[in-house]
């Protein structure tokens, strides 16, 4: 898909910068795997049709081979950098297998493509991507299909949303350690439904803390007033 190729573009450019290897992980789901899950967790499949399973597996291999060929073409044309990469197939529930692989192999980052504006607004990043972001201990980059960027180095300004939680400081440290080889400024953003001077005081305090922790990092902050009624209407 187009959004998978956009994720590959980011991954290959990042691997070139970090002298790393790219692993293309694809997870597929078959009726046979579904039959091994607890009753009620799966749809009512008619198990026993081995031909349908064989067809699924053949299509998965065909799609992955097609993706690999596209990548080879882009490397040959110079559109993608020439870095080491390999393909891995796993059977199971996509989000579970992605998280399991990340726990086993501890990659630098997980890069996932997301659909463009032609998809439903309610599914902004996709349920699989959302689940991985929520549960992963590894940094996750969700790359929109239509983003004009080709690599992380093109992002010169980063918005960091904070709710003044202690976990935000831990999250920022993990973020900074992952991307510290790049040059960017950071805007600390707090969303609120009412004006409160304390919010700006708290943001200013976080800014000063970050200045001490990360000298040389350009940091700004802003309080954004939003209507939560409006936000809920779009959930």
Please report, for each region that a protein language model flagged, where it lies by residue.
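Small/aliphatic-rich secondary-structure junction motif
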Residues: 1-50, 156-222
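Intrinsically disordered or low-complexity boundary/linker segments at protein termini
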Residues: 1-9, 13, 80-82, 108-114, ...
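A short acidic, glycine-rich active-site loop
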Residues: 45-62
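A short helix-to-beta-strand connector/capping loop
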Residues: 73-86, 214-220
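Charged docking surfaces used in two-component/phosphorelay signaling
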Residues: 89-97, 227-228
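Glycine-rich phosphate-binding loop signature in dinucleotide/nucleotide-binding domains
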Residues: 103-107
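Conserved small/polar residues in nucleotide/adenosyl-binding loops
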Residues: 229-235
């Amino acid at each position: 898909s187009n959004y998978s190729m956009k994720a590959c573009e980011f991954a290959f450019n990042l691997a070139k910068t970090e002298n790393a290897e790219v692993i293309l992980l694809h997870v597929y789901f078959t009726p046979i795997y579904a039959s091994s899950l607890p009753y009620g967790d799966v749809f009512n499949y008619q198990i026993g049709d081995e031909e349908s399973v064989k067809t699924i597996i053949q299509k998965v291999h065909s799609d992955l081979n097609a993706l690999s060929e596209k990548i080879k073409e882009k490397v040959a044309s110079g559109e993608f950098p020439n870095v080491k990469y390999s393909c891995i197939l796993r059977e199971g529930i996509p989000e579970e297998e992605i998280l399991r692989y990340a726990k086993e192999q501890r990659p630098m980052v997980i890069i996932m493509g997301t659909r463009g504006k032609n998809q439903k607004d309610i599914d902004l990043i996709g349920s699989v991507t959302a689940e991985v972001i929520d549960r992963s201990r590894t940094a996750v980059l969700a790359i929109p299909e239509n983003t004009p960027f080709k690599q992380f180095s093109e992002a010169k300004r980063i918005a960091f949303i904070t709710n003044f939680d202690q976990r935000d400081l831990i999250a920022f440290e993990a973020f900074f350690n992952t991307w510290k080889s790049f040059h960017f400024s950071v805007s600390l953003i707090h969303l609120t439904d009412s004006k409160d001077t304390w919010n700006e005081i708290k943001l200013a305090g976080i800014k000063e803390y970050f200045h001490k922790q990360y000298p040389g990092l350009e940091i700004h902050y802003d309080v954004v007033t939003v209507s939560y009624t409006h936000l809920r209407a779009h959930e």
